[in-house]
Design a protein with these regions (language model features):
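Core RecA-like ATPase module of SF1/SF2 helicases and allied nucleic-acid translocases
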Residues: 94, 145-330, 335-342
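Conserved interdomain hinge at the start of the Helicase C-terminal
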Residues: 126-139
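Cysteine/selenocysteine-centered motifs that mediate thiol-based redox chemistry or coordinate metal-sulfur cofactors
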Residues: 341-353
């Protein structure tokens, strides 16, 4: 059985490198010691005339996954290597750059570097609450959290307020749910739907809605069907028992009572919350929730940076310099996702927060 690292070990042993003219290594601050050995072997065996290594030690946030940050930093201090710093950011505005610079300069061992922000001033705010209702009414938002548990808390709040959002880059609503709701709504209006839509619809109803042996739609995908046809020929029950005291005609039942398939049933309160808030189920989400680590490489006009910490990161950030440096890098990455506005949120749930960011914010010119 092969582990991931075994591929590197065997590749290094065989020294069967492809012939290259140039060797490019990106995100080099995240490479592990074993991966650096692969780079060394490629440099020796590939015949590459030049090796270009790109990375930013201030964004080295994967030490916990094995990243050898010190190796990357030591390469910049090797006089045999030529350093070409990138001196212009095309993302962050002045106000975000000022804070990000303060955070980066608090890291004890780093490659000294300077870069300019965009000309736009931007905005930087510190808030004592998570403005997850009215504060998100306009614009694109990236809400960044230190841990998966905090992502979960924020997600629950967004669903209560009826916001359509993405989590870790993916919509939290299955498109098939939306297709089923549309299909049932059209049937109730007296319209026809395709066999493909019937298939989706039947998938989201159980035997209390569809007669036994009709659980899978057996019509033709290219044909059209109305509600009466589904009742007469395809097993849709005409009367539905909704509770011990209530039975209703299938023609009078709203989608949120009719569609009771296991996956959809759990999401109905959230789907109804979206609609009550005046939002459309099929709209493109303006809001995304993510951990800081998962957001690396991303950007958004507006970033809400939640500073709550779990005990583990908090303990590491207060016990030793390496822990302080690593946590500073994490929040540096979080802050620099913002293209226009950065909203820094004080601890609201747990016991701990990343306190240095507020010290740096107060000391920004």
């Amino acid at each position: 059985k092969y582990e991931y690292v075994d591929y590197f070990v065997n590749f290094i042993k065989k020294r069967n490198a492809p012939k290259l003219k140039y060797l490019f290594i990106d995100e080099a601050q995240d490479l592990s010691a074993q991966q650096w050995k692969v780079v060394d072997m490629l440099q020796q065996e590939s015949g590459a005339l030049e090796t270009w290594i790109a990375g930013d030690d201030d964004q080295a946030i994967f030490r916990w996954a094995g990243a050898d940050i010190e190796h990357f930093i030591s390469m910049a201090n090797d006089e045999n290597n030529t350093i070409k710093p990138l001196t212009q950011s095309y993302r962050i505005p002045v106000s975000v750059h000022t804070l990000a610079t303060k955070i980066a300069q608090s890291i004890s061992r780093r490659i000294p570097k300077e870069y300019k922000p965009r000309d736009e001033e931007g905005k930087r705010k510190v808030l004592n609450i998570r403005p997850l209702n009215q504060g998100l009414k306009e614009g694109d938002w990236l809400i960044l959290c230190r841990t998966h548990e905090i992502v979960k808390q924020v997600s629950e709040a967004l669903e209560t307020y009826g916001w359509l959002y993405k989590r870790y880059g993916s919509s939290v609503i299955s498109f098939r749910f939306i297709e089923a709701i549309r299909a049932w709504t059209k049937l109730q209006k007296g319209e026809t739907i395709s066999g493909v839509d019937c298939d989706v619809l039947y998938h989201h109803m159980d035997s209390t809605r569809i007669k036994r042996n009709y659980g899978v739609f057996k019509g033709q995908h290219e044909s059209l069907y109305n509600l009466d046809t589904l009742i007469k020929e395809y097993g849709l029950r005409e009367d539905i028992k909704l509770s011990s005291t209530r039975t209703a005609s299938v023609k009078d039942i709203a989608w949120y009572d009719m569609l009771n398939g296991k996956g959809l049933r759990k999401r109905i309160p959230y789907l109804r919350s979206i609609m009550r808030s005046g939002n459309k189920l099929d709209a493109i989400p303006r809001i995304e929730v993510s951990t800081i680590h998962a957001s690396k490489g991303g950007e958004r006009d507006n970033v809400m940076l939640i500073t709550d910490l779990s005990y583990g990161p908090y303990k590491a950030s207060t016990e030793n310099q390496q822990g302080r440096d690593d946590e500073a890098r994490v929040f540096y990455v979080g802050a620099t996702r913002a293209k226009k506005e950065l909203h820094i949120i004080h601890r609201t749930e747990g016991q701990f927060e990343y306190e240095p960011i507020f010290f740096h914010e107060r000391n920004c010119a």
